[in-house]
């Protein structure tokens, strides 16, 4: 029996079965290798504030690359030029634009775009172009929506809660009190190095700094007003009196008004002869006096 069992174990398996057991199953995705890129554009980041209609429009244009970071990818103007080349292929050539990150490349690309806009009599605010070049928060999204309306003649409802003021004031007000910027940090964050290189005018930069300082002071006042306990702000004398005004003070005021009205009424008197007299209070040169008339 033992020999028979050993013989059964030593029997060769069929060719089909041996091939199945000998060859390991290949993994679905080889380890260490990235899957092949699909033709579908990747999903936009959650921080993107573009509407769905604008995102679908960008996907339908079949651009050379999809803008995953709207603030960064539209700053050099290459994608903007590519969008205009799709709509006006005979007036603009994409080969004259360069997809780079240097300030010189950005200024050259946007200078060509501005010439094209002036030729076609299209109007794009220069503030939006300036904010897009220097990566101001929220500005590229507004610029893309303006281009979408300009080319498709369709108005969209903006999904941004607040207007862009080219600073991070709204973002700082949403933060807790501790991690908010100081004045020096606010100046560093809101004035880019590219702005100083493109516009080295000292006077304009000083005006920007003064505006940021005033904005920081306003933010500080609002923080103290909204969070008095954090800053240990004590109430003023007027606030204390309003909060602790006694209830009987209103009764005194009402009584004083009633007594004044009674004093204003004419009082009738009679003299020794029995003739009735009426006292009339007359105000002359600021001093009250009594005038009597015989009836």
Curated annotation (Swiss-Prot):
Residues 48-154 form the Calponin-homology (CH) domain. InterPro entries: CH_2, CH_dom, CH_dom_sf, Spermatogenesis_Ciliary_MAP. Testis. Residues 284-295 have a biased composition (Polar residues). GO terms for cellular component: cytoplasm; cytosol; nucleoplasm. Gene3D superfamilies: Calponin-like domain. Its main location: nucleus. It is found in: Nucleus. Residues 270-282 have a biased composition (Basic and acidic residues). Residues 1-34, 251-295 are annotated as: Disordered. Coiled coil: none annotated. Keywords: Nucleus. May play a role in apoptosis regulation. PANTHER family: SPERMATOGENESIS-ASSOCIATED 4-RELATED, SPERMATOGENESIS-ASSOCIATED PROTEIN 4. This is Spermatogenesis-associated protein 4. The lineage of its organism: Eukaryota, Metazoa, Chordata, Craniata, Vertebrata.
């Amino acid at each position: 029996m033992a020999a028979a069992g050993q013989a059964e174990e030593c029997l060769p398996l069929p060719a089909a079965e041996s091939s199945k057991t000998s060859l390991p199953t290949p993994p679905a995705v080889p380890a260490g290798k990235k899957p092949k890129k699909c033709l579908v554009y990747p999903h936009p980041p959650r921080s993107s504030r573009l509407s769905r209609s604008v995102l679908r429009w960008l996907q339908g244009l079949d651009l050379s690359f999809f803008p995953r970071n709207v603030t960064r990818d539209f700053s050099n103007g290459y994608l903007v030029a590519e969008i205009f080349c799709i709509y006006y292929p005979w007036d603009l050539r994409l080969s004259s634009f360069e997809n780079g990150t240097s300030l010189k490349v950005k200024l050259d690309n946007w200078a060509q775009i501005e010439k094209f806009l002036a030729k076609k009599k299209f109007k794009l605010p220069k503030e939006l172009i300036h904010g897009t070049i220097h990566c101001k928060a929220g500005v590229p999204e507004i610029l893309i929506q303006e281009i979408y309306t300009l080319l498709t003649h369709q108005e969209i409802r903006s999904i941004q809660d607040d207007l862009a003021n080219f600073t991070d004031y709204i973002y700082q007000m949403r933060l807790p009190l501790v991690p908010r910027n100081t004045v020096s940090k606010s100046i560093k964050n809101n004035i880019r190095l590219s702005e100083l290189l493109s516009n080295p005018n000292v006077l304009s930069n000083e005006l920007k700094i003064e505006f940021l300082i005033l904005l920081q002071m306003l933010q500080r006042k609002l923080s103290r007003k909204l969070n008095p306990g954090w800053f240990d702000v004590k109430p003023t004398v007027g606030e204390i009196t309003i909060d602790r005004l006694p209830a009987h003070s209103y009764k005194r005021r009402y009584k004083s008004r009633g007594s004044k009205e009674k004093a204003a009424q004419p009082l009738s008197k009679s003299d020794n002869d029995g003739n009735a007299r009426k006292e009339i209070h007359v105000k002359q040169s600021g001093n009250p006096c009594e005038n009597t008339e015989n009836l």
